[in-house]
């Protein structure tokens, strides 16, 4: 599994913090916006496209409030994403919705919470079963 991470200018500091945290915990991390000053649209598209290259990839996109990146991610065919600002939602969106990507707002989520959100998201596993009905419904919408 590779964690694809990216941010716009407003999310850069938090992105670096999360990236360092994940790498310190032996996750394979690919920063698709390293050294770039991108708008949230471009940064989110970069994350989503890289996530879709492998079924094992997960993505984290960070902007000021998380909403912009969420809107962009959900416009991409086949992408299930969630805007999260708490650990439980991050875990549950993986387990029940099979989300491949989360978005966070650097102006909303503090440092410790951001690390915990990332940890719960990447440690979550899709439960399948009855939840697959919803995932199929989402995929039919694209």
Swiss-Prot record:
Species name: Staphylococcus epidermidis (strain ATCC 35984 / DSM 28319 / BCRC 17069 / CCUG 31568 / BM 3577 / RP62A)
GO molecular function, one term: ribose-5-phosphate isomerase activity
Family (UniProt): Belongs to the LacAB/RpiB family.
Pathway involvement of the protein, from the record: Carbohydrate metabolism; D-galactose 6-phosphate degradation; D-tagatose 6-phosphate from D-galactose 6-phosphate: step 1/1
Keywords, in A-Z order: Isomerase, Lactose metabolism
Assembly and interaction partners: Heteromultimeric protein consisting of LacA and LacB.
PANTHER family: GALACTOSE-6-PHOSPHATE ISOMERASE SUBUNIT LACA (PTHR30345:SF5), RIBOSE-5-PHOSPHATE ISOMERASE B (PTHR30345)
GO BP terms: D-allose catabolic process; galactose catabolic process; lactose catabolic process via tagatose-6-phosphate; pentose-phosphate shunt, non-oxidative branch
NCBIfam families: lacA, PRK08621.1, rpiB_lacA_lacB
Protein name: Galactose-6-phosphate isomerase subunit LacA
HAMAP family linked: LacA
Protein origin, superkingdom: Bacteria
Pfam families for this protein: LacAB_rpiB
EC number: 5.3.1.26
Catalytic activity reported: aldehydo-D-galactose 6-phosphate = keto-D-tagatose 6-phosphate
């Amino acid at each position: 599994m590779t964690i694809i991470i990216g941010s716009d200018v407003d999310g850069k500091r938090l992105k670096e913090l999360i990236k360092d945290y994940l790498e310190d915990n032996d996750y394979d991390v690919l920063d698709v916006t390293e050294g770039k000053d991108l708008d949230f649209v471009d940064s989110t598209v970069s994350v989503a496209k890289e996530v879709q290259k492998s079924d094992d990839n997960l993505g984290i996109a960070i902007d000021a409030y998380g909403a912009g990146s969420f809107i962009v991610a959900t416009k991409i065919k086949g992408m299930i994403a969630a805007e999260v600002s708490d650990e439980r939602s991050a875990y549950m969106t993986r387990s029940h919705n099979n989300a491949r990507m989360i978005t966070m707002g650097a102006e909303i989520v503090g440092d410790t919470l951001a690390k915990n959100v990332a940890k719960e998201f990447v440690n979550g596993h899709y439960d399948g079963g009855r939840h697959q009905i919803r995932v199929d419904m989402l995929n039919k919408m694209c």
